Amino acid sequence: MALPPVKIASRPASPTPSHHHQQAAAASSSSSSSSSHHPPPRIAARPIAPADRSPERVSQHSRGASVHDADSLPPIRPRGSRPSSPSGHAADRAPSSHHNASSTATVPARSTARSLFRDPRTLHPAGRSQSPIAAFRNRSQSSERSRLGPSRSQPNSPLLQSSSLRHHSDATGVHLPPISSLSKELVSDHPDCFAHRRRTPTTSPRATARLHMGNTFRDSSPAASSGSPATMRHDHLAYRHEHSAEEHAKMQRYSDEHPRAMNPTSRASYEHESRGMPYRDSYSAPSRAIEASYHANGARPVHHADSSTNSPQYVPGDVYEHEGSGSPPAAHHAGMRCSNCGVTSTPLWRRAPDGSTICNACGLYIKSHSTHRSASNRLSGSDASPPTHEAKLAAAGPSCSREDDPKSGSCPGDGLCNGTGGTASCSGCPAYNNNLSHALKVSKRESQTSEDPPPARTAERAPPVAEEKMDDDKSVVGALRCTNCQTTTTPLWRRDEDGNNICNACGLYHKLHGTHRPIGMKKSVIKRRKRIPANATAQPTHILDVIPVQMNANGQPVIAPAAGRNAGDSTPKSTESRRASKKSSLTSEQAMREARDREAAMLLMEVGAGARSRNSAQEDDRIHQNGALATSTSFHHDFHSARAGADTARTSHPDDSRSSKRPRQSYPLAPREAYDERDVSAIASPPAYNETHAAGATRSQRSQRSPVDAPLTDRLGRSELHGESSHGTSNAPEHAARASASDGARLGSVVPHHHHHHHHHHANHASHAVHHGHHHHHHHPVTVSASSHGHAGQAPSGMTKLSEVERLRDELLFERRRIDEVLRRAEAILASARAGNFHVEAAGPSTSGLRNGHEASHESPPTGSAQGSPGADARGTRSGHDSIKQEAPDAAPRRSKAFSNSSSSSEKDELESPPPSAHQQLASQPLVAATGAQPASRRNSFEQRMASLPVMAAVPLKRSSPPSTVSNPADNRPLSIAPQPARKATAWGIDTRSTPAASPRSGEKRARADEMDEDDDHWNWDNLYGKAKLEKAGDWRGFARPVEDRRSQSKSNGVTRRESSSTPIAARLPVASSPSQAVSAPRT
């Protein structure tokens, strides 16, 4: 029904059907959607512009033009409104800002209040309240309104409006951006705008207001479609999408289109047609440009041609897809499509292993299944896009689709990018995307600028256009050229502190160096990093990860298991098979890791403990005693145990072996002489210890053998004991099979298997490899040996590299040289002792060993005359070297406990092992044998060895206990009296100079542990704290430390020992680094 020209309630609709390309503009704006062909007189709404309604409205109106310059300029309708036909401009400028009741003559009679609150165009069906409250309530009923019927609140809904409703200005060739909702509008020339505006309740005036991620803010807004003036904006929907890329514009538009009906008077004027029509006219061309940029940014260009579909529900598939998908706009417009499933929109574009661009779904599928997504999964995927999109895309505007452009580009590909495309790998390249996007924007802008906007609209819209163009240029054109190096190719555009666009390289350079990148550093091509191998099948087969070395609770280096080190050999296609292979290879990897663990720990121990772990005199003794045999044997053993351990490591739990290794309480179970006979044979046939004995044997043996019962069995035959106890766990069902072979070898040789040393190294697993050689012959109680077996089986497991063997050999040679020096010293001391100080030997029998019923400590070296007196009782018949080496079995547990936490097991071993040459020479001397083995506290021997190290070559070993005290009953005290300072220093990882401080005063045979700590601290004090001396009680660990007194005394003791040939051999033998020298006097 055409309305009379005076009708204020409705906007004049342009009778002339607009051109197809203008349909969108007319539909979106539906400028005079409800008005008759000639514009009705308008009431200028400008003075009462709703600038006060929402903070955003002010900015919005200011963008268009001054809100209050209605008279000077055509009334500026809020963005959402469609400019009315030019004929209506005069009427629009009508001075009255309020609706006249008389002016609405042709309109159904409405109360003035209603007319004030609602534009007559928003006339609702009878019975609908038009009060502001009702309007507000209706805002929340937008969904309801959309279905209630042709609400006049949205008379201009583009989908509801036919082309006949467009203005004459539509013919000017300026049309609004074909926003998604507008792109598919009907071409209906029906003159009756109201009839066309009125739709059946099924047709929602905001049919395109879908709850997409892009639309939700506006379309799902409660203020949307009911009689609020916001919905009356002609181009509400179109406007919504014009600046989809600009969030601030979106907010402003929302405020524009959904004003709060707070000011009735402003409402009337605000709703008035006059505001929107000129604004709309001026708005169309710039909006087109903006829309062009928007499309270039990624909205799919929509056909402006007439659409055959009448359904408001229909939204162009590509637009719908773009709104719904989270993919960047450029992705849509550049024509990116998944090389696997063909999808053109996806929340995230990924890259396939071959470098092709794939959608998020396909990328995730490949990631989890190591194979491409099947066709069946593709269509069901959420990001599958209708096939029509491609056709539309091809038809849409300038085609910059990746399918054509890369062929024509000159990019060499292979990660060297110049942004022009030309290879299959260019799809997804950021530089190429930038170029495509820029080309699209430029072409859009050119096509838009060809359409001349009406003068009025140009005047109104000019400032916003210039502003937007400036922003557009900055974001589009500027982004394609680095302001620093002027490059147009970069994987990522950044901004400098001034907001200028700079390339990734310049941005990173500035970020790192705080200055702009020199132009000379600019490169013509960008080398892109390939995160995925070029072909999916070519995946690295052997990736040796760096093994992180961690420290466990005991301060022992533990190499974290790196799964998949060997699993890489077979690269299964499915994650399940990969996991299975990883699990299967885990055990063998653990074996290899143990080998690495040992080495790493050896290095750590060398650094941290001053190479004490391997360079100790004890090891030297063993090496010398065994000669080259020890070395070869240790290597043989390492290889053997590595092989055997590799098998066992796979089956036995590494934790068991480790836990068994930890509690090291080595009780000397048999006199050294018992071992001496068998040492050579043991070396000859070094048993390969399987982990079999490691876990179970250690526990069972610990329980089986106590230091008390051990001596008996040890005396009976160490070999049987070894076979039985060390392999005791072989009885365990799980170990039986594994143990059988290795046990056969071990038991086959009556020789005790001197692998107990393995447990010594529990503290530093890495030193095992070396220690295997050195410690072959210090036989710790089977209990310990069990744990050692666990370690030996596991640690060496894995193949030993030739380089490792060579390195071990070099280390052993070095130690042999060091041991030679120690032996020379020991021989000198022994010579002086033989000269006349045999009583010292008598004075220092290892009564501690006797106390427990043990004969000489197991520490006596196998070689030398010591073997000559194998059966001799430790008390009197045992050779001097045996006596020297004897150690109180109870002292050993004590010491091991003390050491278990801080000191490495290798240190403990060192403490226990006697210097070989000294033993040999002493063994030949009956006097020493008669005196009985001197109690060799491991600590004393350790001090001696430490003193004999090359580092301390200038400092002779000084036994704190004077010769007389060696035979003191003080020896009855636990051997813990052995200078513990060495132990403490060991824990600190500092070489204690077993200088005088290391030995307690001559008077205190058994120095208090704290006193020993004091002495040790005293000697370390200079190293750690300079020369500061703590004299007050409580200054250092609560101990008074008369440092000078003790030092001088110990020095004098050492001097007297050296000078007087009558000095007890026990005091001097420590210098020979024979651990048998116990500070404690022999026990009677």
Swiss-Prot record:
It is found in: Nucleus. A zinc finger (GATA-type) spans 338-362, 482-506. Keywords: DNA-binding, Metal-binding, Nucleus, Repeat, Repressor, Transcription, Transcription regulation, Zinc, Zinc-finger. InterPro entries: Transcription_factor_GATA, Znf_GATA, Znf_NHR/GATA. Its main location: nucleus. The keyword Chloroplast does not apply. Residues 245-260, 650-659, 715-725, 875-888 have a biased composition (Basic and acidic residues). The keyword Repeat applies. SUPFAM superfamilies: Glucocorticoid receptor-like (DNA-binding domain) (SSF57716). It comes from the Eukaryota. This is Siderophore biosynthesis regulatory protein URBS1. It comes from Mycosarcoma maydis (Corn smut fungus).
